[in-house]
């Protein structure tokens, strides 16, 4: 709320109050990534917003990936990153790097950042408490140690939330044999939100949301019924990497999440604008 007059701050808080009251005691899952995670100034503002959400009584869960950090570490050890149809191929050596980077560096950096902004948080991963029951990715391509989340045991998450901490979740998990798998963060966020019957799931991205014209950010679709999604995929309005993200949104809504949003994480305080204002800022997915 930099460079805003006291009068405008009061008006903003007045508008936010009913939304704060609505969300108090509810669970909000935030998939954190993109520029909001890579830009230090944006990162600080997002962590400050997350701390604020927790302070007003919202049960916040942050789910993160860390693809660029994984690639950087692989480069340091002289190992080339391999992608198949845009998805990282994870052999056994890469799986060890993924485990080290996501559950180590990235997760603990986020914990430190959020704690520095006044949040109480705990960094965990899908292996902890056997939170994720994982099996090998079932898509058309063999991606090595890339996993699907078959089940989320919510006991650990509920324990952390009950004790007024914010879980920060790194998206790795293991199967019944103890093999460690790299898990898509969008997938993990959706499964967590579904398992907790969260009030809201928010994907922070590098796009304003769904656009009628992908080259014109002024064509934002502010809300959409999930039954209309297939037509937008067929006519090419939704394409490329946005298709799997949107399908996760559909799954979440169909499995008990009240509202799902795709918002522009490049904009300062986009979380607060989406949650606490009449207009919002991204695309909301809902059903009848």
Curated annotation (Swiss-Prot):
Claim: Ion transport is one of the keywords in the record: no
Transition state stabilizer (site feature) positions: 31, 245
Localization annotation: Cytoplasm
Catalytic activity: N-acetyl-L-glutamate + ATP = N-acetyl-L-glutamyl 5-phosphate + ADP
Pathway it works in: Amino-acid biosynthesis; L-arginine biosynthesis; N(2)-acetyl-L-ornithine from L-glutamate: step 2/4
Enzyme class: transferase
Primary role: Catalyzes the ATP-dependent phosphorylation of N-acetyl-L-glutamate.
Protein name: Acetylglutamate kinase
Species in which this protein is naturally found: Brachyspira hyodysenteriae (strain ATCC 49526 / WA1)
Gene: argB
């Amino acid at each position: 709320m930099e460079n805003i007059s006291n009068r405008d701050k009061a008006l903003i808080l007045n508008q936010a109050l009913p939304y704060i009251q609505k969300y108090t005691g509810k669970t909000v899952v935030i998939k954190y990534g993109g520029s909001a995670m890579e830009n230090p100034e944006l990162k600080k503002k997002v962590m400050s917003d997350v701390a604020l959400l927790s302070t007003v009584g919202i049960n916040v869960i942050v789910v993160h990936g860390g693809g660029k950090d994984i690639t950087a570490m692989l480069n340091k050890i002289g190992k080339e990153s391999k992608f198949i149809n845009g998805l990282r191929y994870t052999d056994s050596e890469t799986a060890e790097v993924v485990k080290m980077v996501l559950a180590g560096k990235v997760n603990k950096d986020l914990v430190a950042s959020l704690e520095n902004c006044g949040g109480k948080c705990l960094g965990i991963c899908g292996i902890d408490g056997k939170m994720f029951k994982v099996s090998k990715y079932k898509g058309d391509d063999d991606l090595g140690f890339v996993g699907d989340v078959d089940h989320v045991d919510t006991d650990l998450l509920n324990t952390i939330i009950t004790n007024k901490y914010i879980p920060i979740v790194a998206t790795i998990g293991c199967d019944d044999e103890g093999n460690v798998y790299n898990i898509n963060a969008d997938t993990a966020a959706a499964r967590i939100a579904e398992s907790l019957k969260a009030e809201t799931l928010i994907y922070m991205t590098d796009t304003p949301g769904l656009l009628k014209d992908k080259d014109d950010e002024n064509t934002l679709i502010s809300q959409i019924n999930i039954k209309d999604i297939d037509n937008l995929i067929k006519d090419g309005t939704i394409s490329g990497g946005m298709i799997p993200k949107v399908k996760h949104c559909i799954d979440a809504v169909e499995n008990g999440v009240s509202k799902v949003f795709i918002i522009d994480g490049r904009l300062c305080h986009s979380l607060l604008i989406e949650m606490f204002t009449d207009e919002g800022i991204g695309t909301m997915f809902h059903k009848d």
